[in-house]
Regions:
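P-loop NTPase motor domains
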Residues: 1-181
Length: 181
């Protein structure tokens, strides 16, 4: 998501340190949300990640050191969190990373975005497979307003990654063509 936002904003020439650290923190928080709310899919959202990101548990270094341990977070999310803590010892560095990521996630504070991104009934895993009915997904974005471009870029990226997974399962070729227009 961090890369999608950078690309949609014309970024990519910025300092890779900040982008990488934002991505690492985002990965840790997504893992946190997936583990803590494993039985409640309605809370496995970017909006929930944003709430945690802007809490004292992330900004206050002393609280942050205990945050994942108190919630019994394990494996990759814990490793990513520890990597973040290792880099973000100073208030300025931590503020820069958290502030940059919060800016990129700000769209998930908008009620309309929360509503449409909270769940999906589109079976993207069926794209490119044999099926009885054709599937069409329309994504509209005005040329003059790039406000929601990061979310649209993320959706397209997710679809492309799923298409690669699907093709990998079927001898590196999709059973049905998929067109992006």
């Amino acid at each position: 998501y961090v890369d999608a936002v950078e690309g949609s904003l014309g970024g990519g020439n910025g300092d890779s340190f900040w982008i990488e650290q934002e991505g690492q923190l985002l990965g840790a928080l997504i893992g946190f949300v997936k583990q803590v709310y494993r039985n409640d899919e309605s809370k496995q959202t970017f909006s929930q990640v944003l709430k945690i990101l802007t809490s004292e548990n992330v900004m206050d270094f002393k609280k942050a050191k205990e945050f994942f341990i108190e919630h019994n977070i394990k494996d990759a999310p814990l490793q990513l969190w520890n990597n973040y803590l290792g880099v973000a010892k100073s208030d300025n560095t931590r503020s820069g990373i958290v502030g940059g990521l919060a800016t990129k996630l700000k769209l998930f504070a908008i009620d309309g975005i929360v509503n449409i991104s909270g769940s999906s009934n589109i079976p993207i895993e069926n794209l490119g497979t044999k099926k009885n009915k054709p599937m069409a997904i329309f994504i509209f974005m005005p040329d003059s307003d790039r406000t929601f471009a990061p979310i649209i870029n993320s959706i397209v990226t997710i679809i492309f990654k799923q298409l690669y997974k699907t093709a990998y399962k079927t001898n590196n070729k999709l059973e049905r063509p998929v067109y992006f227009i």
